[in-house]
């Protein structure tokens, strides 16, 4: 358990859940999810 002074110096950041494919965020057509067929 951290001391009060440590908590004041750097407050705890909430752990953010990681996205499964961060590299494909800008390119949805490479993700393998097909929303529409042309």
From Swiss-Prot:
Region Disordered: start-end pairs: 1-26
Keywords from the named record: Chloroplast, Plastid, Ribonucleoprotein, Ribosomal protein, RNA-binding, rRNA-binding
Cellular component terms (Gene Ontology): chloroplast; ribonucleoprotein complex; ribosome
Subcellular location: Plastid, Chloroplast
InterPro entries: NA-bd_OB-fold
Record-level Gene Ontology MF annotations: rRNA binding
Main location (coarse class): plastid
Subunit structure: Part of the 30S ribosomal subunit.
Family, per entry: Belongs to the universal ribosomal protein uS12 family.
Role: With S4 and S5 plays an important role in translational accuracy. Located at the interface of the 30S and 50S subunits.
Name listed for the protein in its UniProt record: Small ribosomal subunit protein uS12c
Lineage of source species: Eukaryota, Viridiplantae, Streptophyta, Embryophyta, Tracheophyta
